[in-house]
Curated annotation (Swiss-Prot):
Sites bearing Cysteine methyl ester, chain numbering: 296
Compositionally biased intervals (Acidic residues): 16-27
Residue list for modification N-acetylalanine: 2
Region (Disordered): 1-63
Record region (Docking to the peroxisome membrane and binding to PEX3): 2-56
Organism annotation: Homo sapiens
Pfam families: Pex19
UniProt tissue specificity: Ubiquitously expressed. Isoform 1 is strongly predominant in all tissues except in utero where isoform 2 is the main form.
Record GO biological process: chaperone-mediated protein folding; establishment of protein localization to peroxisome; negative regulation of lipid binding; peroxisome fission; peroxisome membrane biogenesis; peroxisome organization; protein import into peroxisome membrane; protein stabilization
Family annotation (PANTHER family): PEROXISOMAL BIOGENESIS FACTOR 19 (PTHR12774:SF2)
Keywords: Acetylation, Cytoplasm, Host-virus interaction, Lipoprotein, Membrane, Methylation, Peroxisome, Peroxisome biogenesis, Peroxisome biogenesis disorder, Phosphoprotein, Prenylation, Zellweger syndrome
Protein name per the record: Peroxisomal biogenesis factor 19
The gene coding this protein: PEX19
Amino acid sequence: MAAAEEGCSVGAEADRELEELLESALDDFDKAKPSPAPPSTTTAPDASGPQKRSPGDTAKDALFASQEKFFQELFDSELASQATAEFEKAMKELAEEEPHLVEQFQKLSEAAGRVGSDMTSQQEFTSCLKETLSGLAKNATDLQNSSMSEEELTKAMEGLGMDEGDGEGNILPIMQSIMQNLLSKDVLYPSLKEITEKYPEWLQSHRESLPPEQFEKYQEQHSVMCKICEQFEAETPTDSETTQKARFEMVLDLMQQLQDLGHPPKELAGEMPPGLNFDLDALNLSGPPGASGEQCLIM
């Protein structure tokens, strides 16, 4: 009888130990669960009816989501969250001032993702690119023409975390990385190269029909485009930082010259919206090696 009671006691103890082990495992599992997504900061519409979304709101939402993934690939989770928050703050402030520009960034990003070898997708991307760059050029002009003092401008830049210091709020390198992703050399360079290759024949066939002054402008435009292509083609993976910086400054200077010469012929570059400048000032462009500059004949 005593042996039976002892056996029951041992069995009960084993059951308790098994139960405690299972509970501990469940606790560990609960701790390992990912934290729930933070609640959306978007204000819900009130009972009076749906709220009208301002221009660019949809573009902001999609852009924030895509950039959060971009930051997470660059940093660990804590830094990614911080970078995302800084980027979102800067873009929200930009969207309040220039909602159309934010919307164009999203259109450009979507078009870049769809661009392929077919003419339709390339024309769509080119159109979005031109509109976005036009907005950037307008913003730069407005800033130059504004009456802000140097001190006010410095404070504004610090508020966006884009000052030149090395503080934690400096988001300028991140914004530059975003621009490089949106305006990749693999997408932009082939289109520019194609125009330069078609330009000589176009100039030859329109020599007699164009006013001399306009013809000379087109000749100069072709020459500048070829110089830009040569800069792209001179890039190598072993270039030093000094060489890359010098090439970048040269490209920006050439792009400004290109803008001053006006629009390229629509037969070569496609239709352009009225009043739109062929402005590529703010881009950090570099071209892939391999394409020969010999086809760019300076006329």
